[in-house]
Amino acid sequence: MSTVTITDLARENVRNLTPYQSARRLGGNGDVWLNANEYPTAVEFKLTQQTLNRYPECQPKAVIENYAQYAGVKPEQVLVSRGADEGIELLIRAFCEPGKDAILYCPPTYGMYSVSAETIGVECRTVPTLENWQLDLQGISDKLDGVKVVYVCSPNNPTGQLINPQDFRTLLELTRGKAIVVADEAYIEFCPQASLAGWLAEYPHLAILRTLSKAFALAGLRCGFTLANEEVINLLMKVIPPYPLSTPVADIAAQALSPQGIVAMSERVAQIITEREYLIAALKEIPCVEQVFDSETNYILARFKASSAVFKSLWDQGIILRDQNKQPSLSGCLRITVGTREESQRVIDALRAEQV
């Protein structure tokens, strides 16, 4: 008699799934954490809502209205979720038939697009970016048949560059009437002039992902947004769980999106950009650094001699970076979050001491 294990009972695609390796899952015993693109210091908030005996609103009014005003869109064009990661998944659940439809994304890029699709049983198609990490529009066009959702991260994680806006327009024309194009703008606060939020009126099939995890310094809050036309938002509302935001999360998010909160965020962004330029300049002078790539974000991608040895050496010193060696076209690359000046100096000093 054959014995069926619990794992045997699981769906085949889940048994075969490689989970996303978040910075926290990868662990490490560091005191300089530069591997998750977080803001380096905590921002203080006081809870004002004490109604924890009641279920929260599905889409808290203050959060939606404040974000709509900040993003320059209408409240009915905003959906709030448990981080932008939930937004990624909601779009697949709303638009893709498992076993029939596909998503498409362009590596090297953020890893959750594929994990979300594979979890649901939706095919993943990839079209690697060109040498300058811009979109291969011909390659995308050739693979669009059967694709319902296209994910494009801009600025792109982990490479740090913006996608050419004319290429975005071409992609939106290629997909009109065929697929949803998702612009992942998790890092847009560091280059707000590049946002596509003003394009929603032109493109009914455009969706934009946003988060409070980066420039708003609230990675621990797990609060993200999808901006899209009302027809898209209404479909996402059909598949979102009934209470995506807890009362404390909604309380703090509304405060972070107040006029004072927006000013504080802008000041943080200016400080991070100053620190980023300091770190880029220093990295370019270090012998073990072969190449430093331009960045529009709060992190820097660089290519190193003996990158695995450098990564481990810094890890052993409590400086935790993000190894990008396994990503397509990123051999020898490490990603460094921009932290405080003290953290930057720790990285610079450690790299200068490397004998490779």
UniProtKB/Swiss-Prot annotation:
Record-level Gene Ontology MF annotations:
histidinol-phosphate transaminase activity; pyridoxal phosphate binding
GO BP term (any one): L-histidine biosynthetic process
Which keywords does UniProt give here?
Answer: Amino-acid biosynthesis, Aminotransferase, Histidine biosynthesis, Pyridoxal phosphate, Transferase
Q: Which residues carry this modification: N6-(pyridoxal phosphate)lysine?
A: 214
What catalytic reaction does the record list?
L-histidinol phosphate + 2-oxoglutarate = 3-(imidazol-4-yl)-2-oxopropyl phosphate + L-glutamate
Does rRNA processing count among this protein's keywords? no
Q: Does the keyword Transferase apply?
A: yes
Give the protein's cofactors: pyridoxal 5'-phosphate
EC no. given is 2.6.1.9
Q: Which domain of life is it from?
A: Bacteria
InterPro entries, per the entry = Aminotrans_II_pyridoxalP_BS, Aminotransferase_I/II_large, HisP_aminotrans, PyrdxlP-dep_Trfase, PyrdxlP-dep_Trfase_major, PyrdxlP-dep_Trfase_small
Which pathway is this protein engaged in? Amino-acid biosynthesis; L-histidine biosynthesis; L-histidine from 5-phospho-alpha-D-ribose 1-diphosphate: step 7/9
Q: Which PROSITE patterns match?
A: AA_TRANSFER_CLASS_2 (PS00599)
Q: How does it assemble?
A: Homodimer.
Q: Name the protein family.
A: Belongs to the class-II pyridoxal-phosphate-dependent aminotransferase family. Histidinol-phosphate aminotransferase subfamily.
NCBIfam families listed in its UniProt record: hisC
- The entry's protein name is Histidinol-phosphate aminotransferase
The organism encoding this protein is Shigella flexneri
The organism's taxonomy opens as: Bacteria, Pseudomonadati, Pseudomonadota, Gammaproteobacteria, Enterobacterales
